[in-house]
């Protein structure tokens, strides 16, 4: 069994050690091969461990940091003043090969800037991209990128996102994933020059199973295994999907918990539906991977609870086991070789 180490930014996210420390302890129980390094204020971390009746040991260690990068801090400022920060030190542990992956729920822009600066990009990649799995009506997953690492992208970057997304999805599916570009229509004439140019590049690449365009109403229908878009569009779509799913879950939960005859009827009729809808809960898919780097970095939701952070750590574990950066490099090399000839 391969031992692996995850550096967890214990101060990242809205709740800091109150959530990250219990999540680390739970993750250790899920993965016997896992070691976690908690990076943050040692006093706060130790305090939370004491509440759990736990203490640092050979599988759970603490690296003290004096500073936290705030959510309002600009990436350029965070980059200049990252020394001693929990996020910066967690990324450094990966750069120094003391950890196999980093997980943080902190400032997304700062995380991308620091990761890109400390870990460097893979050869052939111009920009990293955030990717996450989305649930679909069939029960399968769809991987969508970019989800906000870049506000705007050119056609070459979208093409690289497609290559990276395909490499990641292939490790899960064990077959060539269906790759599509998010567009305002499925017809070839639809869309702006950006998506048309990227579609042309993907059509000419046999190493990618490109199936064309899909529309926003197909995101959760299992129409594609990988959906490619720029970060602005992707982030808006992701949050719209999450908000809609949460609305349905909350509405149904309110009906099921009602004490009136209406609530009793709802519990009888919709309890199975509620169980199905819970599979759409965004917390179950927490953990967006920052692809294109020489190391593994996972972005957790800032508002994530304990179970959601456990899911982000789990994603880090799976990516380490699947050697995702190496797989992306291999896929990119094959694609570039094909385009060269």
From Swiss-Prot:
Pfam families: FA_synthesis
Compartment(s) where it occurs, according to its Swiss-Prot or TrEMBL record: Cytoplasm
One of the protein's GO biological processes: fatty acid biosynthetic process
A GO term, aspect molecular function: phosphate:acyl-[acyl carrier protein] acyltransferase activity
Pathway: Lipid metabolism; phospholipid metabolism
Record Gene3D superfamilies: Isopropylmalate Dehydrogenase (3.40.718.10)
GO cellular component, one term: cytoplasm
UniProt keyword annotation of Lipid biosynthesis present: yes
Alphabetical UniProt keywords: Cytoplasm, Lipid biosynthesis, Lipid metabolism, Phospholipid biosynthesis, Phospholipid metabolism, Transferase
Enzyme Commission number, as recorded: 2.3.1.274
Primary role: Catalyzes the reversible formation of acyl-phosphate (acyl-PO(4)) from acyl-[acyl-carrier-protein] (acyl-ACP). This enzyme utilizes acyl-ACP as fatty acyl donor, but not acyl-CoA.
PANTHER family per UniProt: FATTY ACID/PHOSPHOLIPID SYNTHESIS PROTEIN PLSX (PTHR30100), PHOSPHATE ACYLTRANSFERASE (PTHR30100:SF1)
Quaternary structure and partners: Homodimer. Probably interacts with PlsY.
Protein known as: Phosphate acyltransferase
Lineage, top ranks: Bacteria, Pseudomonadati, Pseudomonadota, Gammaproteobacteria, Vibrionales
């Amino acid at each position: 069994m391969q031992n692996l180490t995850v550096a967890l930014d214990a101060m990242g996210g809205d709740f800091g050690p109150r959530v990250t420390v219990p999540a680390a302890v739970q993750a250790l129980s899920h993965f016997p091969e896992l070691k976690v390094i908690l990076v943050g204020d040692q006093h706060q971390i130790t305090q939370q461990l004491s509440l759990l009746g736990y203490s640092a040991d050979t599988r759970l260690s603490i690296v003290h940091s004096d500073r936290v990068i705030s959510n309002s801090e600009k990436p350029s400022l965070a980059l200049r003043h990252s020394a001693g920060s929990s996020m910066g030190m967690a990324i450094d542990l990966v750069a120094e090969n003391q950890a196999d992956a980093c997980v943080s729920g902190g400032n997304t822009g700062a995380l991308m800037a620091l990761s890109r600066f400390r870990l460097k990009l893979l050869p052939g990649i111009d920009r990293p991209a955030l990717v996450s799995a989305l649930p679909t009506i069939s029960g399968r997953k769809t991987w969508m990128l970019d989800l906000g690492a870049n506000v705007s992208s050119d056609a070459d970057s979208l093409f690289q996102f497609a290559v990276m997304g395909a490499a990641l999805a292939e490790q899960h599916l064990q077959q060539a994933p269906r790759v599509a570009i998010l567009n305002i229509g499925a017809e070839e004439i639809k869309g702006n020059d950006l998506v048309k140019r990227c579609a042309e590049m993907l059509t000419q690449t046999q190493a990618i199973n490109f199936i064309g365009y899909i529309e926003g109403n197909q995101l959760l229908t299992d129409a594609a295994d990988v959906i490619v878009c720029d970060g602005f569009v992707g982030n808006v779509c992701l949050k719209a999907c999450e908000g809609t799913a949460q609305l349905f879950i909350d509405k149904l939960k309110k009906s099921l918990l009602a004490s009136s005859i209406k609530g009793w009827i709802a519990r009888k009729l919709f309890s199975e539906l509620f169980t199905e809808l819970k599979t759409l809960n965004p917390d179950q898919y927490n953990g967006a991977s920052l692809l294109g780097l020489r190391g593994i970095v996972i972005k957790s939701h800032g508002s994530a609870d304990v179970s959601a952070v456990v899911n982000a750590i789990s994603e880090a574990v799976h990516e380490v086991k699947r050697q995702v950066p190496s797989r992306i490099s291999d896929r990119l090399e094959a694609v570039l070789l094909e385009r060269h000839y």
